[in-house]
């Protein structure tokens, strides 16, 4: 197929749009940055894209709660299009604020298939903004964005958030997430073992750092792969200057998946 087409969906307060755009372009996708208004007024259509990227930042200033207003705008006019987009097997990725939006929309974890909100990303257990590089373990590489990683592989990725503590509506939802291996990314310490704060920077239940839906085409995570697409943007890049940044494999996995599928 020709290069997969991706849209980086923005609104007031989002950030890292350019990092996401360049990551997609340099992984072989055709990408553009699109304001949510263009989808709301039908200037653009979701059906014209193979991947939607919901960027990080503080959409609408994170008023009410993180991601709530952006999710409300999507629900008002675009929710059926988004649901069809996912059902068709096309890809959605949301780091940080994007993850918060996906949770609000019910696209993740969506264990009952009802597109209802089953979880939340609450205030960090430290009650402060956490911004640093952390260790992440890949638990399941069946997700379209993780195919270039090995299960059990330990990654170093940056975080920057105030509301990242993953909690579920009830024990049943959490049990479904764990039994279906939807907890594709976990916070770990430098030895690759699950631990508490500060290794788990927000106090997420079961050290969950990222979720993928059961279909494998929607990924939400608190870390920012787009910030470490290039080797020189990694915090310890002077220790090993060879190869690509860790984020590169997230985007290459997605582009290769789309080329194979479509």
Each predicted region: which residue ranges?
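Amide-donor transfer/coupling interface in amidating biosynthetic enzymes
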Residues: 2, 39-44, 82-84, 118-262
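N-terminal beta1-alpha1 cap of cysteine-dependent amidohydrolase-like domains
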Residues: 1-95, 99-109, 114, 122-130, ...
